[in-house]
From Swiss-Prot:
Pfam families reported in the protein's UniProt record: Polyoma_coat
Record note on quaternary structure: Homomultimer; disulfide-linked. The virus capsid is composed of 72 icosahedral units, each one composed of five disulfide-linked copies of VP1. Interacts with minor capsid proteins VP2 and VP3. Interacts with host 5HT2AR.
Effect noted on mutating residue 128 to A: In strain: Isolate MAD8-BR, Isolate NY-1B, Isolate N1, Isolate G3 and Isolate N4
The organism's place on the tree of life at top rank: Viruses
Any GO CC annotation of this UniProt entry: host cell nucleus
Functional description taken from the UniProt entry: Forms an icosahedral capsid with a T=7 symmetry and a 40 nm diameter. The capsid is composed of 72 pentamers linked to each other by disulfide bonds and associated with VP2 or VP3 proteins. Interacts with a N-linked glycoprotein containing terminal alpha(2-6)-linked sialic acids on the cell surface to provide virion attachment to target cell. The serotonergic receptor 5HT2AR also acts as a cellular receptor for JCV on human glial cells. Once attached, the virions enter predominantly by a ligand-inducible clathrin-dependent pathway and traffic to the ER.
Recorded consequence of changing residue 321 to I: In strain: Isolate C1
Protein name: Major capsid protein VP1
Protein species of origin: JC polyomavirus
Location within or outside the cell: Virion; Host nucleus
Outcome of mutating residue 345 to R: In strain: Isolate YI, Isolate TKY-2A, Isolate MAD8-BR, Isolate N1, Isolate N4, Isolate G4, Isolate C1, Isolate CY, Isolate MY, Isolate AIC-1A and Isolate Tokyo-1
InterPro entries: Capsid_VP1_Polyomavir (IPR000662), dsDNA_vir_gr_I_capsid (IPR011222), Polyomavir_VP1_sf (IPR036931)
Length: 354
């Protein structure tokens, strides 16, 4: 029996806004073909502190300050963001064309590596009772990862603005009491591995248009870690307009933090415990309007060849330049030097003798 025909008028396809510009790049069509897809597999290791050669993935035992003013943590106590920049195959031999190709991140498979190692309850841990096993890793945990075509942009927020962070870390400068809630001057790019303490920086929700990030924080003293492992979950990186992160300069940026909780030693001291994260990113080619005009490329080339001089300030608030004169062409010098120059209603420069 043939299926019955639908009654009523046929509905037109749903119209959605057409995206023109994403991350400062004018977006065009997707390039198809057998060579238009590539995949990147890698993993990022944790940066918990590593106080010695035997404690990779652990922080130093945490010590507590007596007052807010005296808080000065050791660098080995501070879990930091892990970050990597992955060079991708070059797509454009000629950057002077009107349209060029860019890699676009489409999907991601990711998971934490080594979750079963947290079942170890016999290595120097504090016993739960006289004849019991050691305490498992537990407490506050934070799991975060990002994929982008540019470095992750960060916003600084502090728990205690009077904390003195150690050398070798990058932290919000000139902190005030407003830094404990929101200070828009504390901005940064995640451009260095093992340098940005997790407790100081969060992804900036007002930016990161060309990056996808995901994170979960679970707080508490005795909260157990809850981690899943599977090779069937895929995260789609496309936005509501069907466009993913565009890899500028043929570079893919990845970052991660996986703090699983605290390990309690036999003595009662505690250390952060972190694990590695696996990434598998699928990318495709997308045609875009060339964001690098020839004038920009030539200027950049000339600037790179020009030696940089760290001299006295000649621009900005402390500029020592008093006056700059610009001349164009020649003109007659009148007997009476009184002249008035103005722009007429047609936009032409006029000189009137007074």
């Amino acid at each position: 029996m043939a299926p019955t025909k639908r009654k009523g008028e046929r509905k037109d396809p749903v119209q959605v806004p057409k995206l023109l510009i994403r991350g400062g790049v004018e977006v065009l069509e997707v390039k198809t073909g057998v060579d238009s897809i590539t995949e990147v597999e890698c993993f990022l290791t944790p940066e918990m502190g590593d106080p010695d050669e035997h404690l990779r993935g652990f922080s130093k035992s945490i010590s507590i300050s007596d007052t807010f003013e005296s808080d000065s943590p050791n660098r080995d106590m501070l879990p930091c963001y892990s970050v990597a920049r992955i060079p991708l195959p070059n797509l454009n031999e000629d950057l002077t064309c009107g349209n060029i190709l860019m890699w676009e991140a489409v999907t991601l498979k990711t998971e934490v590596i080594g979750v079963t190692s947290l079942m170890n309850v016999h290595s120097n841990g504090q016993a739960t009772h006289d004849n019991g096993a050691g305490k498992p890793v537990q407490g506050t945990s934070f799991h975060f990862f990002s994929v982008g075509g540019e470095a992750l942009e960060l916003q600084g927020v502090l728990f205690n603005y009077r904390t003195k962070y150690p050398d070798g870390t990058i932290f919000p400068k000139n902190a005030t009491v407003q830094s404990q809630v929101m200070n828009t001057e504390h901005k940064a790019y995640l451009d260095k591995n093992k340098a940005y303490p997790v407790e100081c920086w969060v992804p900036d929700p007002t930016r990161n248009e060309n990056t996808r990030y995901f994170g979960t924080l679970t707080g508490g003293e005795n909260v157990p870690p809850v981690l899943h492992i599977t090779n069937t979950a895929t995260t789609v990186l496309l936005d509501e307009f069907g466009v993913g992160p565009l890899c500028k300069g043929d570079n893919l940026y990845l970052s991660a933090v996986d703090v699983c909780g605290m390990f309690t030693n036999r003595s009662g001291s505690q250390q952060w415990r972190g694990l590695s994260r696996y990434f598998k990113v699928q990318l495709r080619k997308r045609r875009v309007k060339n964001p690098y005009p020839i004038s920009f490329l030539l200027t950049d080339l000339i600037n790179r060849r020009t030696p940089r001089v760290d001299g006295q300030p000649m621009y900005g608030m402390d500029a020592q330049v008093e006056e700059v004169r610009v001349f164009e062409g020649t003109e007659e010098l009148p007997g009476d030097p009184d002249m008035m120059r103005y722009v007429d209603k047609y936009g032409q420069l006029q000189t009137k003798m007074l």
